Amino acid sequence: MPLLKSTFLPSLPFRNGHFNTIYRPLFMKEGHNYKRKRINTWDNDFLDLDFSTIGSNTLVIALHGLEGSSKSNYIVSLVNHLNSLQIDCVAVNFRGCSGEDNNHLHSYNSGKTDDVSLIINHILITKKNKYFSLLFDVNFIFS
């Protein structure tokens, strides 16, 4: 595959990688007020889904990366932005990531798709929306 030359040049402060690292946390809105919904899993455990709804007929399912949660800066930023565009969101907290210990010792990994299937089925049954999914750092296993 040939390499393409890009003509993109970010504005001056964003050309520095260190600036990019500290910019978002310094200027981001603090946290987000979610409405948490706990769903039971097939193995007597649970998953916590954090909803941020504004009454839209479109719902984005945001899946965090390893060591992330619905409180991760990139998820909060995404949810705030999508809500400003009149789009409802559900931020998924995979096992062991919601701030509360799960019932079983095993946690999630990028190859574990049954929890995502459970989440999607739960949302399809309980919500009447158009759906989109966004993925972060999960090795594209769900694509």
Give the residues covered by each predicted segment.
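Short N-terminal helix/helix-N-cap motif within the alpha/beta-hydrolase-1
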Residues: S70-S72, G99
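Short amphipathic alpha-helix adjacent to the substrate-entry channel of hydrolases
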Residues: Y74-A91
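Basic nucleic-acid-binding interfaces
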Residues: V92-N93, S143
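Short beta-strand element of the alpha/beta-hydrolase
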Residues: N57-G65
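Catalytic nucleophile-loop/oxyanion-hole region of alpha/beta-hydrolase
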Residues: H81, R95-F132
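Glycine-rich nucleophile elbow surrounding the catalytic serine of serine-hydrolase chemistry
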Residues: S133-S143
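Serine-hydrolase catalytic-loop signature spanning alpha/beta hydrolases and amidase-signature enzymes
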Residues: G65-S70, C89
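N-terminal cap/lid segment of alpha/beta-hydrolase-fold proteins
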Residues: N16-I54
